Amino acid sequence: MNLVPIVLEDLGTPRARFSLWYVQPGEPVSRGDRVAEVVIPGASVDVAAPVDGTLRECLAFPGDDVESGSPLGFIELQPESQS
């Protein structure tokens, strides 16, 4: 299984509050899809999927404080199409 972390990018503040997942484990995602939301002072920010695949694990949950650079969850890479 090839897992890719969903990493919280640097938002200009060391911490953010995790708000919600837009997808649930087992659901497919495409690169660039919004998969989660975090809140920083004065704004809510969407977190995008870094790759195509399936959300496999959530590490952050609503109300959690999360740090820039920390993984929020993992996406299993979509297997290559068979020719």
Residue ranges of model-derived segments:
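Actinobacteria-biased recognition of intrinsically disordered, low-complexity terminal regions
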Residues: 1, 82-83
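Acidic, low-complexity mobile loops and tails
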Residues: 1-34, 46
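Short, small/polar residue-rich loop motifs at catalytic or cofactor-binding pockets
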Residues: 14-17, 42, 52-53
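Residue-level signal for short amphipathic helical patches enriched in basic/charged
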Residues: 24, 42, 50, 61
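Short hydrophobic beta/alpha edge segments that flank linear recognition/processing sites
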Residues: 30-48, 67-81
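Short peripheral tails and domain-boundary helices/loops at the edges of structured domains
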Residues: 52-67
